[in-house]
Swiss-Prot record:
Family that this chain belongs to: Belongs to the glycosyltransferase 31 family.
Membrane topology: Single-pass type II membrane protein
Essential cofactor(s): Mn(2+); Co(2+)
Enzyme superclass (EC): transferase
Positions in the Lumenal compartment: 30-374
UniProt tissue specificity: In the embryo, expressed along the A-P axis of the neural tube, within the lateral plate mesoderm, in the presomitic mesoderm and the somites, in specific rhombomeres of the hindbrain (even-numbered rhombomeres) and in the otic vesicles.
Name of the protein: Beta-1,3-N-acetylglucosaminyltransferase lunatic fringe
GO cellular component labels: Golgi membrane
Length: 374
């Protein structure tokens, strides 16, 4: 019986040994395949680097120099790629054929126009005669002084913020704080801010915003910088930390969904907006970007359909004017910066070109000359 038991033990040990050897053989083969694959990938990467070096050096250069240049070009390319990846996502064009995410009308939009009393006649009257005349119900003018003539034209939508008339970050942030609170009170779906040197095409604005549910976190506009802005956040107790974020320039206009605006409340409602602006010591539009991107972690959605006087407006094609959402005017590199278009009026009669743009979009306007060729 003892012999039988020993025989069984020997058989079991032999079987286990064979199984173990088989597993080790399989593992060895698998590791060899992985190593070969890694070697192939390394060779492909090295060839890519070498090709970069070869393409950028002369025939007489040393191999070591080629490799250095190859690595330098490779990592420069990586840096550019990362920078591109960090840029805000692009909004679809307003004329997209995709079905709207939400059916909205101009009445769902709260358009805030920031101005100052000294520009009521020179800038604001032009807007009242053009695009605001078609959008009285949607437009609210935020200024810093009483104006009975303005009230006669737009009634309670002329809002005296009682903020300073200075063009300081505190005064600008004061007006933005009032804009935000009035929007929340309105119950409208979208908040859009523009300046008193912007023409707003509400038709294309409605088309763009209809691509997104107003309950979704949306921050849409155009940066004036080609990189995130760098700032210092003051944390209290003399502690500070660096922050960087994208922001949409207020000079081109930007829009915020109601869903996102409500989330901004702890940092924007009441007097909180001005306190937040002081934390980073930057103007109103930068503070909006700080709250949305740096605090709430929502990315800016870039749209090329918004335009400010900070860009070369001559580059806006005449044939594309009707597709834009906002336009502007001013000076660029010491030259008149306006939309370059043949319109209903001469440049002397219409230096901003807003009247000509308006007659292009609304030829039935009583003061527009009939049958104008654009």
């Amino acid at each position: 019986m003892l012999k039988t038991y020993r025989g069984k033990v020997v058989v079991s040990l032999a079987g286990a040994t064979v199984t173990c050897l088989g597993f080790l053989l399989f593992l060895s083969q698998h590791q060899r395949i992985q190593a070969d694959g890694m070697q192939n990938e390394s060779e492909v990467g090295l060839r890519s680097l070498q090709s970069l070096g070869d393409s950028e050096t002369d025939d007489g250069a040393q191999p070591e120099q080629n490799a250095k240049k190859g690595f330098s070009a490779y990592f420069s390319k990586l840096t550019r790629s990362r920078r591109e990846a960090d840029k805000p996502s692009e909004a679809p064009g307003a004329a997209t054929d995709a079905p709207p995410a939400e059916d909205i009308s101009a009445d769902d939009i709260f358009i805030a126009v920031k101005t100052t009393k000294k520009f009521h006649r020179s800038r604001l009257d032009l807007l009242l005669d053009t695009w605001i005349s078609r959008n009285m119900r949607q437009t609210y003018i935020f200024t810093d002084g009483e104006d009975e003539e303005l009230k006669k034209k737009i009634g309670s939508h002329a809002i005296n913020t009682n903020c300073s008339a200075a063009h300081s970050r505190q005064a600008l942030s004061c007006k933005m704080a009032v804009e935000y609170d009035k929007f929340i009170e309105s119950g409208k779906k979208w908040f859009c801010h523009v300046d008193d040197d912007n023409y707003v095409n509400t038709k294309t604005l409605v088309k763009l915003l209809s691509n997104y549910p107003h309950t979704q976190d949306m921050y849409i506009g155009k940066p004036s910088l080609d990189r995130p802005i760098e700032a210092t956040e003051r944390l209290g107790d003399n502690k500070m930390r660096p922050v960087n974020f994208w922001f949409a320039t207020g000079g081109a206009g930007f829009c915020i969904s109601r869903g996102l605006a409500l989330k901004m409340s702890p940092w924007a409602s009441g007097g909180h907006f001005m306190n937040t602006a002081e934390k980073i010591r930057l103007p109103d539009d930068c503070t909006i970007g700080y709250i949305i991107e740096s605090v709430l972690g929502v990315s800016l959605t870039r749209s090329s359909l918004f335009h400010s006087h900070l860009e070369n407006l001559q580059q806006v094609s005449k044939s594309e004017v009707h597709k834009q959402i906002t336009l502007s005017y001013g000076m660029f590199e010491n030259k008149r910066n306006i939309i370059n278009m043949k319109g209903a009026f001469s440049v002397e009669e219409d230096p901003s070109r807003f009247k000509s743009v308006h007659c292009l979009l609304y030829p039935d306007t009583p003061w527009c000359p009939p049958q104008v060729a654009y």
